[in-house]
UniProtKB/Swiss-Prot annotation:
InterPro entries reported in the protein's UniProt record: Secretoglobin_3A
GO cellular component: extracellular space
Pfam families xref list: SCGB3A
Signal peptide, first to last residue: 1-21
Biological process terms in GO annotation: positive regulation of myoblast fusion
Gene: Scgb3a1
Subunit structure: Homodimer; disulfide-linked.
Gene Ontology molecular function, alphabetical: cytokine activity
Function, in words: Secreted cytokine-like protein. Inhibits cell growth in vitro.
Family recorded in the similarity comment: Belongs to the secretoglobin family. UGRP subfamily.
Lineage, top ranks: Eukaryota, Metazoa, Chordata, Craniata, Vertebrata
Protein name: Secretoglobin family 3A member 1
Alphabetized UniProt keyword annotations: Cytokine, Disulfide bond, Secreted, Signal
């Protein structure tokens, strides 16, 4: 029963508008940015993670917490690693942080 409920919650999360937007954005390849524009983009990504007022009710945070995965260290670690990434990975991390923030 727990497995069925978890699967149902995961399907609802993936099929919601946010999940669709995430997968649609991941299919589109961003244009390669010049190296000079990479540093401001990395700083913008690191500072672009807002705190939502209902973050404790988010589905993804609940799923990760039930599996024993803390979300806050994951986001902080991603912020620290953004400055070391290449231009291709900056867009992917930006999408990931946006989805993680949206869900929790």
């Amino acid at each position: 029963m727990k497995l069925t409920t978890t699967f149902l919650v995961l399907c609802v999360a993936l099929l919601s508008d946010s999940g669709v937007a995430f997968f649609m954005d991941s299919l589109a390849k961003p244009a390669v940015e010049p190296v000079a524009a990479l540093a401001p983009a990395a700083e913008a990504v690191a500072g672009a993670v807002p705190s939502l007022p209902l973050s404790h009710l988010a589905i993804l945070r609940f799923i990760l917490a039930s599996m024993g995965i803390p979300l806050d260290p994951l986001i902080e670690g991603s912020r620290k690693c953004v400055t070391e990434l290449g231009p291709e990975a900056v867009g992917a991390v930006k999408s990931l942080l946006g989805v993680l923030t949206m869900f929790g």
